[in-house]
């Protein structure tokens, strides 16, 4: 059942409040590791469709996912924000005429329903097709309760409470004004979240990305509890990442993924964002919980945002970054981008349009060695830095003399560097920090991107690295 009353008349913007943080949470459970024993692999609609994914595009991407990504271990197909938005459209098109929908589709309990604008057939056919193909399906949710539900004061399912009883009307997301936060101290608050996530469980959703949540520990706990109360295993992904703080790891570990960067796009500066956050969170991933460096903006992006409508430039900015385009990173920068995700054991969520994906992008995100490093599940650590050359290492689980190295050139010009075994931290005696075997053994090396193999001797080797490029190596001790 859909209720159609606009939320635009509710005041917004000026009353955004700081996170509501309780001091009452004293013990925190951890998520079940078997839900994400390795970094999740999948596709998310945001980079290519913003918050305007529609039914036909979803189905086309799902079929392309099955053909192009699933054979390589990719599993999660995720519909991002907007699937419940009743958008105003440019006449005769599916292009949006507003950044975020003014109206939302809700049921009588104030719970989200698929949009009649973009999902007139519902999302059940997409869910069923994903499961038929052996894939898992995810949706995006915002923290809190729809402001429309509060205005209508809808009942909280299974209780005598109503939406207005639990809303924290001073807590509004800065970039999407659909919801109020929840006052977690109020009776009915947990019950509301229970009902929202039980509905997703009944739809057979497998993955939930919850946005505007990371700065709100109490609501992280409530949503994690709601998922556990739903009776269905659903992977929980926390977003966005601009305020992620290692001190809050006990809360984040109620989830399976936590964004550690702000939005990442096809810009060289965003490579620096990823490096900087990786440094902070290095070594913190483990089975069931993975720091997330955001989606992979390869291929066609922002497809619902052409530069002009009917020859007239837009007078408002839509969601995401920029207009319709092909990824603007160079081929070398793309190698660096995906190598970071591989060595960091970050979840890999492809963002570009899959039906139109170019062969080069596909070759990077399906490379067996890259995925082997990522799925090894050891979050890489920084072992060397000098003159803007950084070396990151991820060792193979239970095999200290095997692993992967990324030699990154973070300079604005190409560099030639000569590195020895000590620089690369190769040949360290197991269970010691910096005690090298004597003599240091030779290592077999595979240059993953340049498709070369060689023996690395302790004395060293020179590497030529493009600006913002990488040498990505798999290594193992030579016999």
PLM region spans:
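Glycan-recognition surfaces
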Residues: 166-171, 183-185, 235-353
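C-terminal beta-strand-rich structural cap/linker in extracellular carbohydrate-active enzymes
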Residues: 456-479
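Carbohydrate-binding surface patches
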Residues: 335, 341-344, 349, 385-431
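Aromatic-lined carbohydrate-binding/catalytic grooves of carbohydrate-active enzymes
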Residues: 65-129, 133-201, 205-207, 216-217
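Catalytic cores of secreted or luminal carbohydrate-active enzymes
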Residues: 335-384
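Structural recognition of the beta-strand scaffold that forms the well-ordered cores
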Residues: 40-45, 75-80, 85, 136-141, ...
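Mature N-terminal, pre-catalytic/accessory segment of carbohydrate-active enzymes
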Residues: 2-46, 52
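Solvent-exposed beta-hairpin/edge-strand motifs
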Residues: 423-451
């Amino acid at each position: 059942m859909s209720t159609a009353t606009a939320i635009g008349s509710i005041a917004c913007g000026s009353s955004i409040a700081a996170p509501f943080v309780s001091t009452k949470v004293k013990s925190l459970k951890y998520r079940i590791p078997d839900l994400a024993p390795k970094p999740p692999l999948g596709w998310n609609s945001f980079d290519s469709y913003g918050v305007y994914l529609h039914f036909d595009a979803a189905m086309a991407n799902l079929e392309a996912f099955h053909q192009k990504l699933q054979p390589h271990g990719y599993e999660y197909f995720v519909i991002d924000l907007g699937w419940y938005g009743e958008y105003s459209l440019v006449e005769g098109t599916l292009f949006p005429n507003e950044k975020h929908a003014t109206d939302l589709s809700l049921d009588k309990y104030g719970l989200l329903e698929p949009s009649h604008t973009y999902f007139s057939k519902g999302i059940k056919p997409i869910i069923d097709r994903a499961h038929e193909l052996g894939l898992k399906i995810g949706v995006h949710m915002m923290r809190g309760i729809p402001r429309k539900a509060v205005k209508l004061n809808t009942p909280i399912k299974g209780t005598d409470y109503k939406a207005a009883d639990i809303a924290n009307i001073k807590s509004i997301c800065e970039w999407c004004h659909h919801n109020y936060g929840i006052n977690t101290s109020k009776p009915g608050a947990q019950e509301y979240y229970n009902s929202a996530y039980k509905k997703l469980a009944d739809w057979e959703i497998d993955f939930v990305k919850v946005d505007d949540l990371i700065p709100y520990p109490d609501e992280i706990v409530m949503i994690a509890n709601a998922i556990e109360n739903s009776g269905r295993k659903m992977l929980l992904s926390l977003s966005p990442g601009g305020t992620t703080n290692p001190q809050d790891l006990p809360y984040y570990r109620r989830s399976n993924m936590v964004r550690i960067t702000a939005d990442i796009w096809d810009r060289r500066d965003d490579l620096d964002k990823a490096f900087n956050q990786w440094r902070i969170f290095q070594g913190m991933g483990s089975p069931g919980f993975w720091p997330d460096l955001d989606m992979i903006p390869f291929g066609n992006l922002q497809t619902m945002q052409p530069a002009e409508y009917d020859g007239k430039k837009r007078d408002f900015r839509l969601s995401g970054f920029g207009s319709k385009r092909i990824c603007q990173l160079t081929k070398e920068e793309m190698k660096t981008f995906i190598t970071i995700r591989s060595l960091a054991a970050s979840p890999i969520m492809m963002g570009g349009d899959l039906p139109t994906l170019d062969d080069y992008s596909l070759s990077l995100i399906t490379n067996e060695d890259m995925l082997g490093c990522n799925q090894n599940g050891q979050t890489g650590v920084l072992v060397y830095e000098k003159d803007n050359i950084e070396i990151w290492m991820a060792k193979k689980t239970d095999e200290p003399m095997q692993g992967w190295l990324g030699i990154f050139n973070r300079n604005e010009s190409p560099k030639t560097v000569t590195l020895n075994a000590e620089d690369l931290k190769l040949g360290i005696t197991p269970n010691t920090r910096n005690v090298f075997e004597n003599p240091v053994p030779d290592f077999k090396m595979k240059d993953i991107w340049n498709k070369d193999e060689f023996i690395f001797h302790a004395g060293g080797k020179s590497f030529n690295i493009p600006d913002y490029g990488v040498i990505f190596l798999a290594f193992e001790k030579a016999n």
